[in-house]
UniProtKB/Swiss-Prot annotation:
<feature type="binding site">
    <location>
        <position position="399"/>
    </location>
    <ligand>
        <name>ATP</name>
    </ligand>
</feature>
<keyword id="KW-0812">Transmembrane</keyword>
<dbReference type="InterPro" id="IPR013210">
    <property type="entry name" value="LRR_N_plant-typ"/>
</dbReference>
<protein>
    <recommendedName>
        <fullName>Probable inactive receptor kinase At1g48480</fullName>
    </recommendedName>
</protein>
<dbReference type="Pfam" id="PF13855">
    <property type="entry name" value="LRR_8"/>
</dbReference>
<dbReference type="GO" id="GO:0042802">
    <property type="term" value="F:identical protein binding"/>
</dbReference>
<dbReference type="Pfam" id="PF08263">
    <property type="entry name" value="LRRNT_2"/>
</dbReference>
<dbReference type="InterPro" id="IPR017441">
    <property type="entry name" value="Protein_kinase_ATP_BS"/>
</dbReference>
<feature type="modified residue" description="Phosphoserine">
    <location>
        <position position="450"/>
    </location>
</feature>
<dbReference type="InterPro" id="IPR001611">
    <property type="entry name" value="Leu-rich_rpt"/>
</dbReference>
<feature type="modified residue" description="Phosphothreonine">
    <location>
        <position position="526"/>
    </location>
</feature>
<keyword id="KW-0472">Membrane</keyword>
<feature type="repeat" description="LRR 2">
    <location>
        <begin position="98"/>
        <end position="120"/>
    </location>
</feature>
<dbReference type="GO" id="GO:0005886">
    <property type="term" value="C:plasma membrane"/>
</dbReference>
<dbReference type="GO" id="GO:0004672">
    <property type="term" value="F:protein kinase activity"/>
</dbReference>
<dbReference type="Pfam" id="PF07714">
    <property type="entry name" value="PK_Tyr_Ser-Thr"/>
</dbReference>
<feature type="modified residue" description="Phosphoserine">
    <location>
        <position position="373"/>
    </location>
</feature>
Length: 655
């Protein structure tokens, strides 16, 4: 056998050739990113919405809107509210193996969840709320062991809540409300911080591990037990066991003697009966007197003309007070009453009911609203707002519009556009009532009131100041809500952005209110002087609102958040030195001493640079020239870059 040896020169040539061959092969990371890119393009083809403006000429998807990459892999896909529709096909998520955050919320996606979602085993945050997914919650979800946040609310999922959720041992948020789930809730021993199963056909008792959540986590179900009412078997007091047979207790003779001794005479019994009758009569008499007083008080409150005369001019976020007492009005005053104190005439029976939007659960009607107790929350630009308490768990806000001069058909067309707005940073409009003399809007009640009240309320001793984390989260939430409004079309704007129209949930999530109302009311109601300090300089006609005007108003709110100063209090002379001009007049190196709210400085020593950048953004938004102001989408992007996602953002789904 012959053995051939290559000369040194031949070996060198071979080594170079092999090296070049290896270099010409695609790197594994490049292959993976290409697979991610292919998967994203497949998703676009299947369910593409209006904002899929991806530049497919780019070889890397990492610069596409909503896509985030790390180490040359797609790790986050955020496409909320971009009109995605249809079923998600199999084979997409099988390639997105490094995905950690997936947000497809507030779209129109339907069908069942794809089975290959389980291959995205690194998923930590999954936001699918506000779609049309149906069928049972798939078992594939329970293999995502790293999942921390899961939101499947407001879909059409059916079946029971699986005990497979117990596999998700890191889960802190589970939202399943507004589906069609049935059966009982399994005992979920999980480190949950947020949990909600409201508006489902659930029954049985609430497991012990979930009883730590408040009652609003279980609304509109047939569940029982803490924190809701006791279950029937818990209410029943077990009777004492009786002895069987005819056995005579050993102490029967002694008990017979006691019975004789304790037996009451006829006179004593008669005295007791007479005393009870007299006592009962006194109680009835007292109740009649109290009811008469209450009836008189209520009838006075229902007199709409009296209420009109007494309602004071107050900011929209404060309560109306007379002689130190909050006006207590029935919902008849807050609801379907006419301007002359009589029921609306000539409008037909159709005007005598509340009209609910979309698939909103009709948990009450106009009669319930009329019977509810209510109180005046405040009088704002578009009318008076009331808090109506329907029952122990249902509280709504009713806005009684003024100066609405339009026909039923036109009002219906415009208000249905408002009711169709659906975003987590907007106060949802649940229902409306229309008659010749009354126009009412029913919203979710926001328990924390407005940003204005929180910023400018009691600033004395005992006040809990807002730290920078909360303020910046409020700012981003409000910006997202306004950006959503603007995304509905170039002609869609708010027209009345101010801190009293930014309402807050218990967890200080911002929700923009009063959107879409500027086009409903007359010019007298939208007098621009009512928005002193927030109005863009080019706005002279309150009916001609614009998106650039909204950006200006939002910039004022942003400066208000950082300075702690109310814009209406910043006018120093007849020329109107408003808040933006005052901030601009202060040199940047003096902002810490002159501009920043002193409450912030005592709490946020590490975030002053971020605060300064937010001030700069507020000044950009309040440019005197509309064309120099950024779009709200750009404002949101800049704010998110300034304030990276934190744990609190994730808990509140700021994705």
């Amino acid at each position: 056998m012959r053995v051939f040896f290559f000369p040194n020169s031949s070996m060198a040539i071979l080594s170079v050739f092999l090296s070049l061959l290896l270099l010409s092969l695609p790197l594994p990371s490049t292959q993976d990113l290409n697979a991610d890119r292919t998967a994203l393009l497949s998703l676009r083809s299947a369910v593409g919405g209006r904002t899929f403006r991806w530049n497919i000429k780019q070889t890397s998807p990492c610069n596409w809107a909503g896509v985030k990459c790390e180490s040359n892999r797609v790790t986050a896909l955020r496409l909320p509210g971009v009109a995605l529709s249809g079923d998600i096909p199999e084979g997409i998520f099988g390639n997105l193996t490094q995905l950690r955050t997936l947000s497809l919320r507030l779209n129109a996606l339907s069908g069942s969840l794809p089975k290959d979602l389980s291959t995205s085993s690194n998923l930590r945050h999954l936001y699918l709320q506000g779609n049309r997914f149906s069928g049972e919650i798939p078992e594939v979800l329970f293999s995502l062991s790293h999942l921390v946040r899961l939101n499947l609310a407001s879909n059409s999922f059916t079946g029971e809540i699986s005990s497979g959720f117990t596999n998700l041992t890191k889960l802190k948020t589970l939202f399943l409300e507004n589906n069609q789930l049935s059966g009982s809730i399994p005992d979920l021993d999980l480190p949950l911080v947020q949990f909600n199963v409201s508006n489902n056909s659930l029954n049985g008792s609430i497991p012990k591990n979930l009883q730590r959540f408040e009652s609003d986590s279980f609304l509109q179900t047939s569940l029982c037990g803490k924190p809701l009412k006791l279950c029937p078997d818990e209410e029943t007091v077990p009777s004492q066991p009786t002895s069987g047979g005819n056995r005579t207790p050993p102490s029967v003779e002694g008990s017979e003697e006691k019975k004789k001794k304790n037996k009451l005479s006829g006179g004593a019994i008669a005295g007791i009966v007479i005393g009870c009758v007299v006592g009962f009569a006194l109680i009835v008499l007292i109740l009649m007197v109290l009811c008469r007083k209450k009836s008189n008080k209520r009838s006075r409150a229902v007199d709409i003309s009296t209420i009109k005369q007494q309602e004071p001019e107050i900011p929209g976020d404060k309560e109306a007070v007379d002689n130190g007492n909050v006006y207590s009005v029935s919902a008849a005053a807050a609801a379907a009453m006419t301007g002359n104190g009589k029921a609306s005439e000539g409008n037909g029976p159709a005007t005598k009911k509340l009209v609910f939007f979309g698939n909103a659960t009709k948990v009450f009607d106009l009669e319930d609203l009329l019977r509810a107790s209510a109180e005046v929350l405040g009088k704002g630009t578009f009318g008076t707002a009331y808090k109506a308490v329907l029952d122990a768990v249902t509280v709504v806000a009713v806005k009684r519009l003024k100066d609405v001069m339009m026909a039923d058909k036109e009002f219906k067309e415009k208000i249905e556009l408002v009711g169709a707005m659906d975003h987590e940073n907007l106060v949802p409009l649940r229902a409306y009532y229309f008659s010749r003399d009354e126009k009412l809007l029913v919203y979710d009640f926001m328990p924390m009131g407005s940003l204005s009240a929180l910023l400018h309320g009691n600033r004395g001793a005992g006040r809990s100041p807002l730290n920078w984390d909360v303020r910046s989260r409020i700012a981003i939430g409000a910006a997202r809500g306004l950006d959503y409004l603007h995304s509905q079309g170039t002609s869609t704007s708010h027209g009345n952005i101010k801190s009293s129209n930014i309402l807050l949930t218990k967890s200080h999530d911002a929700k923009v209110s009063d959107f879409g109302l500027a086009q409903l009311v007359g010019s007298s109601a939208t007098n621009p002087n009512r928005a002193t300090g927030y109005r863009a300089p080019e706005v002279t006609d309150p009916k001609r609102v614009s998106q650039k005007g909204d950006v200006y108003s939002f910039g004022v709110v942003l400066l208000e958040l950082i300075t702690g100063k109310a814009p209406s209090n910043s006018v120093m002379n007849e020329e109107g030195v408003d808040l933006p001009r005052w901030v601009k007049s202060v040199a940047r190196d003096e902002w810490r001493r002159e501009v920043f709210d002193s409450e912030l400085l005592s709490l946020a020593t590490d975030e002053e640079e971020m605060m300064a950048e937010m001030v700069q953004l507020g000044l950009e938004c309040t440019s005197q020239h509309p064309d120099q102001r950024p779009e709200m989408s750009e404002v949101v992007r800049k704010m998110e870059n300034l304030r990276p996602y934190s744990g609190s953002d994730q808990v509140n789904e700021a994705d």
